[in-house]
Amino acid sequence: MILVIAEKPSVAQTIAAVLGAKEKKDGFLTGSGYIVSWCVGHLVGLSEAAAYGEQYKKWSYDSLPILPQEWKYTVASDKEKQFKTLKELMHRADVSEVVNACDAGREGELIFRFVYEVAGCRKPMRRLWISSMEEAAIKEGFSRLKNGEEYDALFASALCRAKADWLIGINTTRLFSVLYNHTLNVGRVQTPTLKMLVDRDAAITTFKKEKYYHVRLALSGAEAASERISDKAKADAFKTTCEASRAVCTSLVKEKKTAATPKLFDLTSLQREANRLFGYTAKQTLDLAQALYEKRLLTYPRTDSAFLTDDMGDTAAGIIKLLCGKFPFMAGKDFTPELGKVLNSKKVSDHHAIIPTMELAKTDLAALPESERNILTLAGARLLMATAAPHTFEAVTAVFECAGQSFTAKGKTILCEGWKEIDRKYRAALKSKPETDDADSDTEKTLPPFTEGQTFENPAAKVTEHDTTPPNPHNEASLLSAMERAGSEDTDPDAERKGLGTPATRAAVIEKLVKGGFVERKSKQLLPTKDGINLVCVLPDTLTSPQLTAEWENNLTQIAKGKADPAAFMEGIEDMARELVKTYPFLSDDKAQMFKPEREALGSCPRCGSPVYEGKKNYYCSNKECIFTMWKNDRFFEERKVAFSPKIAAALLQSGKVNVKKLYSPKTGKTYDGTIVLADTGGKYVNYRVELPKKK
């Protein structure tokens, strides 16, 4: 029997159906010589720090740095049953080999290898490496299974990534949390990402708006604009001068230009466009693309390539023909794809670009959930655009001289709409129309037929007022672009992988920052919180700079190719952890209070006037020399079965009394309405009394 282990139950079921393993068992399927089971994501992971000794259970500076000599692994508590199933299957006498069918990438390799190692399996291992869940792709993948050893370098890279994240994450999080008395989650990728958000926020906050002006001449129905003028009075005076002068066309330049077709989607560009068009978060887009992949409708989503392999021409042509028949916005269009633009095996590493599959022929698009349909249609539309003709146009720039200054008018004439016709029709078919970026809109009109030397006497003129604009806050689309480019200017130009994180991890990084309270979403915007801004301010450049992380990613890529030493990489990580702990032994008291939560005072102390705050068990005066305290479990309130709430405490502090309904009488066993009065006499304990409403 051959044991096949997939990453998820849904993928296992698809593979089992192709292999003929139809008999369902508890935690696996079997039949036709195969057993197909699954991991349910990360079944096994690196153990928490506490597993390495009692001294690490409590967070303290003295226990840092934590540098495991022998790494320990832990089975996820909620997945122990499935791990036990896999371990038993691996050790079954009739199982001769194990096939790793987890996702074809760094994390998929790690998920499988952790289970394989912790289960103590030593049976031969082979690797299934596919980019599509279509039946034909699965069959082809099983016909060319590779020896597991060929992916040892990929596993080494994945293991280094996991250990490096553990070492930097655990040590820096504990270090700065202890120093600042507040849980501060620090991460190799998330902290430089947060820094980019904080930098953008600072640029917006410090931006000073300035007005500027243009003088515009009306020339045969076209407008020619002057250079910027900073002074309104000068602009008005110049306008008057122009209206009494002659404008002469001194230059007329016509250029044929081409807007190249967009590339196919890799994961990051798909996430950016889905955010721009539909407002989906990076995580939502990844989840939707993964769901479509598991339904065999989309190719593997966690890719960083925007090309197909050279041998995929016929496949792409078949899918394009299918899309032309499926998409209403392609109805009646005679479309001949230019496939050569999207085929380039040299630019495909693990997986090719994201495109729909032929499974679409059997699928009713209308039956899909709207969000999945949006992603599938978006990927299909991009395949059509990428193989369409270029968009060509003639750009005309006319320069005029008037009153000693230059004026410019620009226009364009479309020669071939090309791929932009598909883009326009696709957008028009969308249920909700996205906002159009300035870069995408063709605002330039066709200019009149000007000629050099042409003159205009006393042209009409006007002054237009404008404001300089601050940078826009980051949204998911712009942040993903920034993460992708981060560190590029400081990184070796020959580096194969640059930027923060990988296409597969960037969505999770953004979500972690939001959940940690360092970033908040406002509509489509991603804004740093006060804690986020403070965290970036207190951390050293080594943790906030994207350069280091970008270098790490490139090193991990080289390890995956067998071109770099994993041991040397880990030694550098450990040295960094040691250096950080040595550099930050203590803080001044004012800095240590930086992350102390801002408390809202309930009122003023009736004895000294200082703010009164809520504690776990009481309401206390903030003046350490004052002993005024109202206890939540005061017998006065407990006897009357009244919860001493912050609302009651605030009313007592403000007016000395509060009306309360349904006070319990221990004497009569009944309830009544009354007024609780703060009867403070200045002693150790605060006294209260009840006043009953006066009878009319």
Residue spans of the language-model regions?
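Basic, low-complexity terminal or inter-domain segments flanking catalytic cores
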Residues: 2-3, 25, 79, 90, ...
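C-terminal or mid-to-C-terminal helical accessory/interaction module adjacent to the motor/catalytic core
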Residues: 135-217, 254-258
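Conserved short loop/turn motifs at secondary-structure junctions
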Residues: 1, 101-104, 181-183, 254-263, ...
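Amphipathic alpha-helical transducer elements in NTP-driven molecular machines
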Residues: 9-16, 33-36, 40, 76-87, ...
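Intrinsically disordered, low-complexity regulatory segments
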Residues: 1-162, 166, 427, 470
